[in-house]
Every structure is written in C-alpha cells, then in structure tokens.
Amino acid sequence: MKILAYCVRPDEIDSFKNFSEKYGHTVDLIPDSFGPNVAHLAKGYDGISILGNDTCNREALEKIKDCGIKYLATRTAGVNNIDFDAAKEFGINVANVPAYSPNSVSEFTVGLALSLTRKIPFALKRVELNNFALGGLIGVELRNLTLGVIGTGRIGLKVIEGFSGFGMKKMIGYDIFENEKAKEYIEYKSLDEVYKEADIITLHAPLTDDNYHMIGKESIAKMKDGVFIINAARGALIDSEALIEGLKSGKIAGAALDSYEYEQGVFHNNKMNEIMKDDTLERLKSFPNVVITPHLGFYTDEAVSNMVEITLMNLQEFELKGTCKNQRVCK
C-alpha cells in the first residue's frame, strides 16, 4: 500500500523505515499535522496515518475522500479527534492502536502521584532560585492513602499493579466493565463511593458522551478535602474551570494533568515565543500544586515503536482483507 504519514516526529522515522519494509508498504513521511489545509497532499496515496492531535474533521475527511483515500490509521489509542460520522459517510475505513504500551502510561502515572504527594516540581522550582528551605514541602506517604482508579482496562490494571508495590492503605476502583484480574488488588465501588473515599483519584477511561466532564463541580464536592487528582487519559474528562475552583478553595490538594481538554494545537508544539491565548491553561500553570505535562505519558521508545508497527500492520490488514481487527469505522 502507498501511504502518506502526517505529523511524523523524528523519533518515529527509524520505525517507519523498518516496519514499512516488513509489511510491504511504500510510506512517505511529512512533519505537517493533518488537517483541511494539507489534506490535498494525500492525492495519489491509498491510505494515510495521523496522530491524535491532528484535525480530522468533516472538511479534512471530505478532501481525502476526493483524493481517493480509503484507509486512515491513527497512531494513537484516542480517536476523539476523528469525525466518525463523516468517515462512514465517505467510505473511509479507520483503525487505531488500542494498546501500544500500557506500562508507559502506568509508570508515568505513578510518577505523577509521587510528584504531587511529595511536592517534587515545587521543590525543583525553589532550588532553581537557591531556596533550599523545607518549609511548605512536607509530603504525605502513599501507604497512608486510599487510591481510587477510574477505568480499569489495560492501562488502569497496570496502574493498579504499579501502586500495589507501595502498600497503599486501600485501593478501590470503578469501571462499567469490571476486570477480574483487577479484583486481585482492588475493591470495586460505585463512582460516588470512589469520589467519597479516595485520597488519590486517577483517571484511565476513554472519553465518551456519558463521561464528558465527569470530574466537575458536583463530583468534586463529593470528594475528600485534600484530594489529589491525576488525569493521564483524556482531557475532557475534567471540567477545567471546576478544577480551578477546587484548587482555589483548597478542596483539591493537587492535580497532575498529562491531558487537558483544550490541548489540541498546543500540546506537542513549541509555543515558547508566542503569546498564549488560553487563559484557563495559564491559570492552571500558575498553581504551585499543579503539574502539567504535554501528553507524554505514552512517550517511551517501546511505545513509539509499537504505535508505528501496529499502524502499518492495520493498513496491511486492510489491504489484504478489506477489514482490520482494530477497525473503528466500517465502510
């Protein structure tokens, strides 16, 4: 298959070279993020590959349809940037990478929890200013805390296994689909019970219409005073304005955001010399007890390699069978 890969980072190039040969593809790589303005570049190709922050709206999909594109493979698990109704209408088959390295996100989540509970980022900022005092840096020990995991699939399970080594006081979780393996470590509770009982709440659920802004004013009010919130899943699971109010009131002791609801066009881009227009993000950055990372929980050498390989495997399967096990939209 002849493929155009958009938004290719330098760290992906070797994997594309190696796996394109393995799966019999001809792949051209460009750094441009996919969107309506560059969709015309797909002319002459059979399929394209994109990333999760690319703009895959109706306009862009119609343009690649006019270019003859039948297959679209995102190198991510998340697909919230893709207009599925338009893809189906235009006969474009879509596939994703449902699991590239659950360990990468789970390890990062544990790191975020330690960063919050031990105030590591705040301490680092103070040291940069030659402030070596201990005042304001006292932390809490994980073994005295209850962990609440929302979403216990592949990544959530690895998160649970990772925290189990710290001897947490208790581990509880919520998922509409209970994981039998997770039951070896956690007790399943209702969502309200997780909000009420957990000292650390970590999110590992996909974004759906039903859980949009699940962490909002009402749910935060149900939480313990001094709760820590971690989001290494999808940004729009959290209502950012409600989060800010919770931080200002002291209800929330700290938040770690590797995903942010308005991250598209910002995360994974260098904005150092630009005036930031997102006042909400700027307010979140101003809190000393908020850790923001640019959606890099997935970002390990193994995960990047797997993302590229599974993407090219998906496109090979489309070419040979007309369908794919990781297909998200049927023609």
From Swiss-Prot:
Metabolic or biological pathway, per its Swiss-Prot or TrEMBL entry: Amino-acid degradation
One matching Pfam family: 2-Hacid_dh_C
Binding site for NAD(+): R154, I155, D175, A205, P206, N211, A232, A233, R234, D258
Gene3D superfamilies, per the entry: NAD(P)-binding Rossmann-like Domain
Gene Ontology BP annotations: L-phenylalanine catabolic process; L-tryptophan catabolic process; tyrosine catabolic process
Top-level enzyme category: oxidoreductase
Protein name: Aromatic 2-oxoacid reductase
Naturally occurring in which organism (per UniProt): Clostridium sporogenes (strain ATCC 15579)
Gene name of the record: fldH
